[in-house]
Amino acid sequence: MKRIIVFFAVIVQMVFLSCCVEKQGYYNSGEESIIALICDITWTGGKKEYEDGSSWESIWNFDKDGTYTRTNVEIDKDGNKKEGEIRGRWSFATPNFSTLYFGGSHYWDIKELDKTIFSFYDRTGELNDPLMSKEYVEFYPYNEEKD
C-alpha cells in the first residue's frame, strides 16, 4: 500500500513539475512565428489621455530569453515625463503556445496575434476556478512619437 501511495505521489509531482516548463530544443516554424510576433514587436495598449492634460502609457518589450520589460510612461499636465521600468519573466504555459505564464497564477490567454494586434485575456487564477478573474486586453505595435 505504501508503494502505491509513493508511486501516486511521484506521478502527481511529475505532472505539476512538467507544467509551465520552458520547451527544450528546437522550435518548429509555427512556434518560431509566435515567438517572433511576441518578441520582435514592441507592444502597447495605447496612450491614455486624461481631462487634465496628463497621459499614461505602458510599453512592453518581450525577449526570447524569457524576460520582459514593461515601461510605464507618465506625462503630467505640465509636460513633465516620468518613466518607470518593471522587469519580469515569462514562458509559454501550454504546448501549443496559446498562453503566456508570468508566475504565480498570472496568465495571458492569447486570442489574436499578428503584426497589427496582440489581444488576450489577462487572467489571474486557474481555469475553472470560481475565483478566477480575467479581462480582455488589446495591444498594438508601439510607435514612438517624435517631438
Feature roles, as predicted:
Residues 1-18:
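Sec-dependent bacterial lipoprotein signal peptides
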Residues 20-87, 93-147:
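Lipid interaction determinants
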